[in-house]
Amino acid sequence: MGSVMMKIRVMPSDVDVDLNEVLEKIKNIQMEGVEIRDSAIQPIAFGLKAIVLMAVMPDMEGIGDRYIEEIGKIEGVESVEIEDMELL
């Protein structure tokens, strides 16, 4: 079994959401085998910013969906989407 790297975009529910706090909560999510390799806060438009993560996880059915679901439960998160995924 290999690993996959996912590029994940996390959009806040409002421009006033503290993205550093949201990012810390994301980093505190405990899922076996999931490792955040890189993270950044990127400007989108009109003062809106998003968190972009590079996460590595086992190539197992459903683990990416469960991780996305956990991120979506964080207060201040509007949406979570996978922008890119590749096998390692």
Swiss-Prot record:
<dbReference type="InterPro" id="IPR004542">
    <property type="entry name" value="Transl_elong_EF1B_B_arc"/>
</dbReference>
<keyword id="KW-0648">Protein biosynthesis</keyword>
<dbReference type="InterPro" id="IPR014038">
    <property type="entry name" value="EF1B_bsu/dsu_GNE"/>
</dbReference>
<keyword id="KW-0251">Elongation factor</keyword>
<dbReference type="InterPro" id="IPR036219">
    <property type="entry name" value="eEF-1beta-like_sf"/>
</dbReference>
<comment type="similarity">
    <text>Belongs to the EF-1-beta/EF-1-delta family.</text>
</comment>
<dbReference type="InterPro" id="IPR014717">
    <property type="entry name" value="Transl_elong_EF1B/ribsomal_bS6"/>
</dbReference>
<dbReference type="Pfam" id="PF00736">
    <property type="entry name" value="EF1_GNE"/>
</dbReference>
<protein>
    <recommendedName>
        <fullName>Elongation factor 1-beta</fullName>
    </recommendedName>
</protein>
<dbReference type="GO" id="GO:0003746">
    <property type="term" value="F:translation elongation factor activity"/>
</dbReference>
<comment type="function">
    <text>Promotes the exchange of GDP for GTP in EF-1-alpha/GDP, thus allowing the regeneration of EF-1-alpha/GTP that could then be used to form the ternary complex EF-1-alpha/GTP/AAtRNA.</text>
</comment>
